[in-house]
């Protein structure tokens, strides 16, 4: 079926031959610059004979490579953080199956980073370069390296497509903890490994890639960070011909200065894409994150109000802001009679895109800048919403509603802005086609699980005794005992109670059991 899909996708290509069968039995008759092992290595034991099926398979793949060729392996990480956080093992759908060592399974294996490094080295590929696709190699939206793993927000929330994923803890928080310990590369969800028989020589070093392939064709772009000599550059390129004009227009946008002390980072258009030097300073989000840790709420407000007053200094009242161009981008949902608007307007003005530069600020990622009036409150609402999503601790200091109120944004505005955002995201820019298959993570309360389990192991009962006035709560003893060797044993001590005329024993637990009075003294 996969071969059929591949064929129908690429039937017009003249340089592609599709062969179906066991690759170990094929003789391709030549050597290649690249051999791609994508989602295959983990199954090597099921179609390769011998005591070392994985090494045997990789050596076979090496026989198809030129001496200067490269082997590309894409595979899940056995110790991926998603598995600890509650995702089932990808190949068996069993929670923690890989972490537990695939007990009783003889068809599939994945590997930790160390295991994969050693396996590939023993198979004849001593030169290796690791990349980390995120959320995983099957549907990547970003690709990280060791140089960008701790600096480019690896670990953001992402959609899931299985209804068997439980929510044991925040995967994002787990990854952040691993970053602080400098071991995040051991807990990434997937590996993309480039390996060679000889040293891997490149003219430039790729540090990071972001893919926007889920958008409409005219907005599909690829952004990558590249190190050349001693400088790091960002490049944004169209993923298809339809997006070429979109990318080309960014050079003009890069020359704009949205407000006093704020300017877009200049870029130049070359070789079909835009190029600009990567900034290394702190972002406004970094600054606010530090202020959150110090619980300096007042300084957070002053920082955001400074942005608002400077970037939107030229805002003016616009009763006719919902123009035809506006409705094309944000939809027909009616807004208020008027808003204070700015033009041109960058609706993606989030704190992570604003870098400190001395006393001033430089703005990156300004691709969603429009030349018609847009409410300043709408842009500010998007900035605030993004902050609270990316810095959860902020909500404990100052609620998002209160923050909105600081900028005159009421709940009715939020409903309008959300409708505009939904239209922009899903209708204008275009959303990922996989969105319709998204599933919710299943909430799990481990404390409740422990409590329920303990209750099954506990037995509650109450003994009433009558001293002449009948049975009553005042004359009762309640006790709880633990299951011991397959039975509950309950003892009531009544030696200090005189003139007992009768007793009654009540079960308080919903337990079916056989009752036996062992001693009555």
Explain the meaning of each model-derived region.
Residues 129-224:
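Rossmann-like AdoMet/SAM-dependent catalytic core
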Residues 208-259, 286-288:
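ATP-binding glycine-rich loop module of kinase domains
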Residues 91, 95-104, 328-396:
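Catalytic activation segment of kinase domains across protein kinase-like and atypical kinase folds
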Residues 264-331:
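Conserved structural core of kinase catalytic domains
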């Amino acid at each position: 079926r996969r071969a059929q899909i591949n064929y129908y996708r690429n039937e017009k290509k003249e340089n592609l031959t599709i062969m179906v069968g066991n690759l170990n039995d094929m003789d391709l008759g030549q050597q290649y610059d690249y051999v791609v092992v994508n989602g295959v290595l983990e199954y090597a034991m099921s179609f390769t004979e011998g005591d070392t099926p994985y090494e045997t398979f990789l050596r076979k793949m090496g026989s198809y490579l030129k001496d200067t060729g490269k082997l590309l392996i894409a595979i899940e990480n056995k110790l991926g953080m998603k598995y600890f956080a509650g995702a089932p093992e990808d190949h068996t759908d069993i929670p923690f199956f890989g972490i537990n060592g695939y007990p009783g399974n003889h068809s599939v294996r994945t590997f930790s980073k160390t295991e994969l490094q050693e396996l590939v080295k023993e198979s004849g590929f001593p030169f290796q370069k690791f990349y980390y696709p995120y959320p995983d190699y099957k549907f990547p939206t970003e690709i990280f390296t060791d140089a960008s793993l701790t600096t480019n927000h690896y670990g953001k929330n992402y959609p899931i497509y299985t209804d068997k994923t439980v929510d044991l803890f925040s995967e994002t928080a787990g990854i952040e903890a691993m970053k602080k310990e400098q071991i995040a590369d051991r807990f990434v969800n997937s590996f993309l490994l480039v390996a060679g028989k000889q040293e891997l020589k490149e003219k430039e070093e790729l540090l990071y890639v972001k893919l926007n392939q889920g958008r409409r064709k005219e907005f599909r772009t690829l952004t990558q960070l590249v190190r050349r000599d001693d400088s790091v550059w960002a490049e944004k390129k169209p993923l298809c011909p339809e997006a070429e004009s979109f990318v080309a227009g960014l050079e003009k946008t890069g020359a704009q200065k949205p407000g006093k002390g704020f300017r877009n980072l200049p870029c130049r258009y070359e070789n079909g894409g835009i190029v600009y030097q990567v900034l290394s300073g702190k972002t406004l989000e970094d600054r606010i994150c530090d202020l959150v840790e110090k619980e300096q709420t007042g300084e957070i407000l002053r920082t955001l109000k400074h942005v608002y007053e400077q970037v939107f200094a030229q805002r003016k009242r616009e009763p006719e802001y919902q123009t035809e161009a506006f409705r094309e981008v944000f939809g027909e949902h009616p807004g208020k009679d008027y808003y204070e608007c700015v033009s041109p307007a960058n609706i993606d003005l989030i704190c992570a895109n604003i870098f400190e530069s001395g006393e001033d600020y430089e703005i990156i990622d300004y691709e969603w800048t429009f030349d018609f009036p847009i409410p300043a409150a709408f842009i500010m609402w998007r900035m605030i919403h993004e902050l609270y999503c990316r810095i959860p601790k902020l909500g404990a200091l100052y609620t998002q509603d209160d923050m909105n109120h600081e900028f005159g944004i009421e709940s009715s505005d939020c409903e309008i802005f959300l409708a505009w955002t939904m239209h922009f995201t899903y209708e204008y820019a275009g959303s990922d086609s996989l969105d319709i298959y998204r599933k919710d993570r299943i909430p799990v309360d481990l404390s409740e699980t422990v409590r329920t389990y303990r209750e099954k192991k506990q037995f509650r009962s109450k003994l009433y005794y009558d001293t002449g006035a009948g049975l009553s709560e005042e004359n009762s003893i309640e006790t709880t005992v633990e299951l011991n060797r397959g039975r509950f044993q309950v003892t009531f001590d009544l030696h200090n109670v005189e003139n007992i005329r009768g007793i009654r024993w009540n079960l308080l637990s919903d337990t079916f059991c056989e009752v036996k009075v062992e001693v009555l003294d």
